[in-house]
């Protein structure tokens, strides 16, 4: 992929009419840690709709993940009135949980 020393693993999740490609890069040993912010160019995250955001926050906290803030109320866009929260997985990938209004 143009990165000397990097290796990747690829998996596909398929359903009728849909295909999701999951790519995991294993960085070369000389790669330092990078912590991106939601406002940074190239930022990526995965989002999940949930029924009870407070229950999810409690569950991920119990599992050792730390939300980046308390759930916030969404005040613009298609999710206006809902609640959202970000956390990071052990690899630093940002995960968003969103509860619809």
Residue map of PLM features:
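Vicinal oxygen chelate
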Residues: 15-20, 24-91
């Amino acid at each position: 992929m143009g990165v000397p020393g990097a290796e990747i693993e690829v998996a596909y999740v398929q359903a009728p009419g849909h295909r999701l490609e999951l790519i995991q890069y294993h960085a070369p040993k000389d790669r330092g840690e990078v912590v991106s912010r939601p406002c940074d160019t190239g930022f990526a995250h995965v989002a999940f709709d949930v029924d009870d955001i407070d229950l999810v926050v409690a569950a991920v906290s119990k599992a050792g993940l730390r939300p980046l803030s308390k759930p916030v109320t969404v005040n613009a866009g298609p999710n206006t009135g809902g609640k959202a929260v970000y956390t990071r997985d052990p690899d630093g990938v940002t995960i968003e949980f969103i509860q619809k209004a």
